[in-house]
Amino acid sequence: SLTSRNLVATVGADHWHTVVVDECHRLAADRFDTFAKAVRPSVLLGLTATPERSDGQPIAQYFDARPDGSPAVELRLWHALDLQLLAPFEYYACDDATDFSEVPWDRPGEREAVDNLVTGNDVRARLVINEWRRLASDARQSRAIVFCVSVAHAEFMTDWLNRAGLPAACVVGTTASEERRRAPQRLLSGELCALVTVDLYNEGIDLPMVDTLLLLRPTQSPVLF
């Protein structure tokens, strides 16, 4: 990597005329922050579709802005959808009556509190499956990714889907690499109709066969939404 090879120290901070940083919302992470503050190109161009970071750290500090503080060029996802630059989608919100009012949002214990409400919740799991079947012409023919709260929740939902006749595989960080590699192909072939996961397939992945997303974790993040 740029950091491990000490390229800035080796060739000089002003060696590059132009530096392009893709996925520049990652700049606020420690190792990228060090590089961004060390390099001195004539042009530093950052590209991202999700400028908001979940930890709230700003990325504007790394770049020059217009007098009003806005980016040099900005086209948000919702505007790109309006301009038909991205594939359109239909979004359905289904009320499962789960009471999340006591969840400590954006504070320690948030994920654990949500996990306790949804993992093992048979009523909610049954409703999810019924709503999927109601909204899809044929849920078995879907190619879905199911985003869950935790590994335990993913395993719970995988069991429910399989028992309902909707073949699914749980694919999480601890899943064997060969199984993870084969999972998208199994989805494409129709052997599976769902991959159930937690923090995989969030970004930097191209799965054109996917036609359905089930977001089974509540979120206040505009990035995830």
Model-based region annotation:
Residues 18, 25-91:
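Post-DEXD/H (motif II) to motif III coupling segment of the RecA-like Helicase ATP-binding lobe
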Residues 69-145:
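Conserved interdomain linker/interface between the two RecA-like ATPase lobes of SF2 helicase motors
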Residues 145, 154-162, 166-202:
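Conserved helicase ATPase core of P-loop NTP-dependent helicases/translocases
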Residues 1-18, 29-34:
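Conserved helix/coil segment N-terminal to the catalytic DExD/H
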Residues 16-17, 193-218, 224-225:
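A short beta-strand element within the Helicase C-terminal
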